[in-house]
Curated annotation (Swiss-Prot):
Glycosylation sites: N357
Keyword Glycoprotein: yes
Major subcellular site: membrane
One Gene Ontology term, aspect cellular component: plasma membrane of cell tip
UniProt name for this protein: High-affinity gluconate transporter ght3
Functional description taken from the UniProt entry: High-affinity gluconate transporter.
All ranges on the Extracellular side of the membrane: 31-58, 109-112, 166-179, 286-301, 350-363, 426-432
UniProt region (Disordered), positions on chain: 492-555
Native source species: Schizosaccharomyces pombe (strain 972 / ATCC 24843)
Single GO biological process annotation from the record: carbohydrate transport
């Protein structure tokens, strides 16, 4: 398996994000379908011949999936430690498939829909921990951030596709309108479960389990280098020594992730993922219909498609920001800009969108849509993908699965709070809710400045060293620059030594060949002399390299 194919497969694991986006992106449209409402809504208006949901029923149908995600995120750790990330991803993909099957066959009980959404949440929550963690362990550090960011790209892409599917199926007769959406979601789960079987296991997990030869082979395939390569040997020995040091303390217990050396990172990961949701990105998708109606638009499915397209298109900006602007700056300035967007959105919505006589100001609605789109652009280039990157690369291997579970549970806790409580709060204060989100974004900006350290381009082992040091978060970029400078210098020195040693070997070969010709030896014996003379030299060169005390070059 060459490097390109393996890289494609590592990106393919972001299909886990596709499952999340497909499920969350389809439910709002499905709830608005006439046939679905007639079967599962709890309110009927005979005058208008229409169905609707009570606040409690709507909160349960939209919010309980996040409760399932919270449970699934915590459940992923014991599975990872027992069977590894690869087969854990396969297992929880199966859980998601079963959940979608329950949803497809949910007639006429709304309780079955509720159970199906909770079970789907368990699968999605576990996959949201496993997939970014797997990608962080397998991807090279130079592109690790971009690879993990593809999780968010897949998620937003799936939400757009789901909105388009809903728009195309909502006019179908009877149950086909919503069963089609659930059925297609089930196909995505099958695709992931089958595809993951072709992925290599994480080398760090294999070394952790004592399967060194298998780990070394996978590392060689990923880098397209031989096992004797200094880069491979250095990386392998670094990972192995770090694992041995970490495992010297025995199997990590849950209480240890709140111990002195690790609780800072545990809390940081949890807070980043919690505020990733509390800053209000999903609010726009839940209440886009109201805003778009203010502009005169009546199609309830079109707003989801428009916002989904913006959400998906702008997420590609994260591929640039993550590995060029780093981790801290996009989060700090992104949240500050989002605070401004929400403040203007709330002010216009509260004062201008709806008049007392019930009419709406189309210009006010247009302004709100513009700032909704600006918010989504900023979010998709910063907080959207960056949370998964931080969770994937911040924790040491001994605690990684447990810390990632706790951190990701913050994401689903925040999502649950938004989806469950927003209907009640919005009914009470309307667009003033935007002021609250503006304050949360501003707080998030300061939180990142004082807590998160810059980790752009660092290996997972260097990230661990950084957080174990006393370097202040706002000074951590200096550490990153020093590491990058040292790495570039080492690479140039290594290339220079390789050229010099290669010249020396060629000179020896020519000398031996000339001596062999003078002695009138046959071609076969001459060849044997050259090989026997060169091989020890290559071995000596290799040994000399590993004796040097120099900073490693990482793949």
């Amino acid at each position: 398996m060459n490097r390109f194919i393996t890289s494609i497969l590592v990106v393919f694991i972001s299909m886990s994000g596709w499952l999340q986006g497909a499920d969350t992106g389809s439910i709002s449209g499905i709830l608005g379908m006439r046939d679905f409402q007639s079967r599962f809504a709890d309110r009927y208006n005979p005058i208008s011949n229409s169905y609707s949901y009570s606040a409690w029923r709507q909160a349960l149908l939209t919010g309980t999936i996040n409760a399932g995600c919270l449970f699934g995120a915590m459940l992923s750790s014991p599975f990872t430690e027992r069977i590894g990330k690869k087969y854990s991803i396969c297992f929880f993909s199966g859980v998601y498939i079963i959940a979608e099957l329950l949803l497809v066959t949910a007639v006429p009980s709304w309780i079955q829909v509720l159970v199906g959404k909770i079970l789907a949440g368990v699968g999605i929550g576990a996959l949201s921990v496993l997939s970014p963690g797997y990608q962080s362990e397998v991807a090279p550090p130079q592109i690790r951030g971009a690879v993990v960011a593809t999780y968010q790209i897949f998620s937003t892409g799936a939400a757009l596709v789901a909105a388009c599917i809903n728009m195309g199926t909502h006019k179908l007769r009877k149950t086909a309108s919503w069963r089609t959406s659930f059925g297609i979601n089930m196909l995505w789960g099958i695709l992931l479960m089958v595809g993951v079987l072709f992925l290599p296991e994480s080398p760090r997990y294999l070394i952790y389990k004592g399967r060194d030869e298998e780990a070394l082979r996978i590392m060689c395939n990923m880098a397209e280098l031989s096992p004797e390569s200094e880069i491979i040997q250095t990386n392998f020995n670094t990972i192995k020594s770090d694992i041995e040091i970490e495992m010297a303390g025995g199997k990590a217990r849950w209480i240890e992730i709140f111990g002195k050396d690790i609780r800072y990172r545990t809390c940081l990961g949890f807070l980043v993922m919690l505020f990733r949701e509390l800053i209000g990105n999903n609010y726009y998708f839940y209440y886009a219909t109201q805003v778009f109606k203010g502009t005169g638009m009546t199609d309830i499915f079109l707003p989801a498609v428009i916002l989904g397209a913006i959400n998906f298109g702008t997420t590609f900006g994260a591929l640039y920001t993550i590995d060029n602007l780093g981790r801290r700056n996009p989060l700090i300035f992104g949240a500050a800009f989002q605070s401004i967007c929400f403040f203007i959105y709330a002010a216009v919505g509260d004062r201008k969108l709806i008049y007392k006589n019930g009419t709406s100001d189309h210009r006010a609605g247009s302004v709100m849509i513009v700032f909704s789109c600006l918010f989504l652009f900023s979010y998709c280039c910063s907080w959207g993908p960056m949370g998964w990157v931080i969770v994937g690369e911040t924790f040491p291997i001994r605690y990684r699965s447990k810390c990632a579970s706790v951190a990701t549970s913050g994401n689903w806790l925040g999502n649950f709070m938004i989806s469950f409580f927003t209907p009640f709060i919005n009914n009470a204060i309307g667009f003033k809710l935007g002021y609250i989100y503006a304050c949360i974004n501003l707080f998030s900006s300061f939180m990142i400045f004082f807590l998160a350290k810059e980790t752009k381009g660092l290996t997972l082992e260097e990230v661990n060293d950084l957080y174990m040091s006393n370097i202040k978060p706002w000074e951590s970029y200096k550490y990153v620059r020093e590491i990058e400078s040292h790495r570039i210098h080492f690479s140039k020195e290594e290339e220079k030594r390789e050229r010099e040693k290669s010249k020396g070997i060629r000179g020896q070969e020519e000398e031996f060949i000339e001596n062999a010709d003078e002695d009138n030896n046959d071609s076969s014996s001459s060849s044997g002399s050259v090989v026997s003379a060169v091989k020890p030299r290559r071995s000596a060169v290799s040994n000399d390299r590993f004796s040097e005390d120099s900073h490693p070059t990482y793949i």
